[in-house]
A protein has these predicted regions:
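Pre-Walker A (Motif I) flank of P-loop NTPase domains
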Residues: 86-90, 101
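P-loop/Walker-type NTP enzyme "switch/lid" segment
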Residues: 45-76, 80-83, 94-99, 117-198, ...
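Conserved beta-strand/loop subsegment of P-loop NTPase cores
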Residues: 146, 168, 220-261
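Acidic-aromatic/histidine active-site loop/patch
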Residues: 1-77
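Hydrophobic positions on the alpha1 helix immediately C-terminal to the Walker A/P-loop
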Residues: 104, 108
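Aromatic pocket-lining residues of Rossmann-like dinucleotide-binding sites
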Residues: 112
Length: 261
């Protein structure tokens, strides 16, 4: 849920459009789809069985549930905001571990991809990576390999089918993540990814746990804050959002799930 947020849906009518306008719109849609097909070069595609995924990944399993609809609403909010101001990189953050940040990031990616947006989810919680276990994947190359060893970042990207979004996982824990996230290589990697995606989501470390999340704030255009009801105090929330300016907070997801990762 996004407290205090309202959602404005834009309806397009073709009734008043001229044939040339309709043709132009069709060309634009075709160009967008061509870009979607040609720009992104994931190293491999993996088809996953949604029925075997954790229950938290509800958008993968049943798009008709109330929870999945909430992710669709969040996706609409993000897309609407991005149409009004330059937003591409989204920090998905929480005050502490166990609030559902990773599941929110992956569910949001699924909802955006189903809305025909090109999405990359980068696992930037380098001290406690969980993408591979969460999605049941294995990887020989990950985000930290690309940064520390000079390996092509694209070689670490995996396309998740049948949902159509990409993930950039981290294979193993990093003792000093700030060194990697503050390196010129990280900024250069993001700059390479920018043209290929409509949205890049950062699944970050908890804001209160480590200092390296503040480094990601510099690279992000906006933030989605995940709070687990009954777990995080108002004082912890205030401290967590201290590095963020109000205009850099898109909204808050109040997570009430019993099982959170």
């Amino acid at each position: 849920k996004k407290g205090g947020q309202t959602f404005d849906f834009v309806n397009y009518s073709l009734n008043a459009a001229t044939p040339s306008e309709i043709e132009q719109r069709n060309r634009e849609l075709a160009a967008h789809e061509a870009a979607r097909q040609s720009l992104i070069r994931p190293s491999r595609e993996v088809t996953i069985d949604a029925a075997r995924l954790p229950l938290q990944l509800i958008s993968f399993q049943d798009a008709n549930t109330t929870a999945a609809e909430e992710y669709n609403r969040l996706a609409v909010l993000l897309m609407t905001t991005a149409s009004e101001q330059p937003i591409k990189r989204v920090l998905v953050a929480s005050a502490q571990h166990g609030e559902g940040r990773t599941s929110v990031a992956l569910n949001l990616a699924c909802a955006l991809s189903l809305a025909q947006r090109r999405v990359l989810v980068a696992e930037t919680d380098l001290q406690k990576p969980s993408f591979l276990d969460f999605l049941g994947l294995s990887a020989e190359v990950g985000l930290t390999d690309a940064l520390a060893k000079g390996i092509s970042a694209g070689s670490a990207v995996v396309r998740i089918q049948p949902f159509g979004f990409d993930v950039l996982p981290t294979r193993e824990q990093v003792k000093h993540p700030a060194e990697l996230l503050s390196s010129p290589s990280f900024g250069e990697m993001l700059a390479l990814f920018d043209p290929d995606y409509d949205f890049i989501l950062f699944d970050s470390s908890p804001l209160l746990a480590v200092a390296d999340t503040s480094l990601l704030v510099r690279h992000a255009d906006t933030t989605v804050l995940v709070i687990r009801s009954g777990k995080t105090t108002s004082g912890q929330i205030s401290k967590a959002i201290a590095p963020l300016t109000p205009e850099k907070i898109l909204g808050v997801v109040l997570n009430r799930a019993d099982r959170i990762t």
